[in-house]
């Protein structure tokens, strides 16, 4: 645990001194900070309960990530042959397939797929899972993992079909029931999702899924009297007494315009209609349990508080585009985008800049009192309102620097590399040739040059 002089803390797996710098490791990535900015280093302790974005847990935007825990009976015998030295052996896969034993071959491809899933190479993972299903199309475990992959890559409609097949193949699988619940929730089948999740926790208690059931039940209660309208890319749910027809029409028009703009900016489109739910302020906080400083939530559904609004105000327009941008980013990055990059891009495309706060940020970076960017990979929900404001500003500053220096196209390439399995820092290195440490130094110079110190 590294205690910084600015009062912040970094949780690291390994720490070492290197001259004037302190180097530390988090996962596969290494970082360096000036020794002069460190107050002390302590061994032990338990990290705070949030996950880095490389693990894709983003509670205020997406449902908690669920990874199945099942295995196949031949896995233990094959695992070391299929994966060794950290890589899948394609020759071993070919040799296994030549034996002409469907169960053995399916297991080999399944092992390879799980390895690539853990490494973040979701495209290769998909190919291996599909190969496994060619040899065992009704294997509930493979179907469950494949459905989980489809959810991770924002293809919930297809995930419903595969998860349903998994449940029909093995109704007593808690993993299959859980994944089916996720897929149903993401495709606006909330009642069905609750039933599936309840079956899952009956088979195997799970506190996280119990919380999802409670959230879904709050949603159903809040939206019991809601009506619905659809446009080309959106499904709008609303309470008639809370919104006028003119506001609903203007909202859909604004969202469709934002959708087209984001397709041009980011070069990708979500695979299915996006659900937008309009709440009174109280219902919004009742359903989402979001912190008081949040203006909206995108947890796979855009949840927007609109108390007292009769038109699409400039503030509401920015919120709509910000939250919609998260849906596009999730699609491109396979749900793996770190929080700082996700929030930075969403702010940039509102559009917003740090112009009004640039001088203050320049001073913070100049005196090394900023929040280290690598610690902003995880969810901002753990921050106080003041810390969250700084985290959002730093995120926007970093993304604004990348955009103004290298262009928006490099932001898109960073997202694509993350979606292909790269860590955030590896994606930065392969596009703008910067580590996190380099990026912080470059952002500091950018802010001082643009806004003064």
Identify the meaning behind each predicted range.
Residues 225-338, 349-358, 367-370, 374-381, ...:
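Juxtacatalytic substrate-recognition/specificity segment
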Residues 1-135, 185, 194:
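Compositionally biased alpha-helical segments
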Residues 103, 137, 171, 204-205:
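Short coil turns that delineate tetratricopeptide repeat
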Residues 108, 142, 176, 209-210:
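TPR alpha-solenoid repeat register
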Residues 374-453:
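Pan-zinc metallopeptidase signature
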């Amino acid at each position: 645990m590294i205690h910084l002089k600015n009062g912040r803390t970094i949780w690291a797996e390994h720490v070492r001194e290197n001259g004037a710098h302190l180097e530390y490791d988090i996962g596969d990535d290494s970082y360096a900070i000036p020794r002069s900015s460190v107050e002390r280093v302590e061994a032990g302790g338990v990290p705070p309960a949030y996950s880095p974005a490389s693990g894709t847990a983003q509670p205020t935007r997406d449902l908690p990530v669920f990874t199945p825990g099942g295995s196949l009976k031949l896995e233990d015998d094959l695992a070391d042959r299929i994966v060794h030295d950290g890589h899948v052996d394609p020759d071993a896969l070919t040799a296994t397939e030549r034996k002409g034993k469907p169960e053995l071959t399916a297991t080999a491809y399944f092992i390879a797929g799980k390895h690539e899933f853990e490494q973040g190479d979701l495209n290769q993972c998909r190919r291996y899972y599909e190969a496994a299903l060619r040899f065992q199309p009704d294997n509930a475990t493979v179907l469950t993992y494949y459905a989980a992959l489809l959810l991770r890559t924002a293809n919930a409609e297809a995930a419903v079909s595969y998860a349903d097949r998994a449940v029909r193949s093995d109704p007593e699988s808690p993993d299959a029931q859980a994944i089916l619940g996720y897929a149903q929730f993401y495709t606006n089948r909330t009642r069905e999702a609750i039933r599936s999740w309840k079956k899952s926790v009956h088979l195997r208690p799970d506190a996280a899924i119990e919380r999802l059931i409670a959230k879904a039940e709050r949603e159903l209660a809040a939206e019991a009297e809601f009506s619905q309208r659809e446009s080309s890319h959106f499904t709008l749910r609303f309470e008639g007494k809370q919104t006028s027809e003119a506001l609903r029409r203007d909202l859909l028009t604004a969202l469709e315009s934002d959708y087209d703009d984001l397709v041009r900016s980011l070069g990708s489109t979500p695979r299915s209609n996006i659900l937008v739910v309009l709440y009174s302020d109280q219902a919004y906080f009742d359903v989402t349990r979001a912190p008081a400083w949040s203006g909206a939530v995108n947890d796979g559904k855009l949840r927007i508080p609109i108390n007292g609004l009769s038109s699409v105000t400039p503030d509401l327009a920015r919120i709509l585009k910000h939250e919609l941008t998260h849906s596009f980013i999730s699609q491109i990055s396979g749900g793996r985008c770190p929080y700082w990059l996700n929030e930075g891009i969403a702010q940039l495309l509102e559009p917003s800049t740090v112009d009004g706060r640039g001088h203050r940020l320049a001073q913070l970076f100049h005196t090394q009192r900023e929040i280290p960017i690598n610690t902003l990979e995880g969810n901002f929900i753990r921050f106080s309102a003041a810390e969250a404001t700084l985290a959002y500003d730093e995120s926007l500053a970093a993304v604004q620097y990348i955009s103004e220096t290298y262009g928006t196209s490099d932001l898109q390439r960073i997202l694509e590399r993350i979606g292909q399995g790269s860590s955030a820092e590896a994606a930065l290195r392969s596009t703008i040739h910067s580590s996190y440490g380099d990026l912080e130094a470059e952002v500091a110079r950018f802010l001082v040059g643009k806004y003064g110190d």
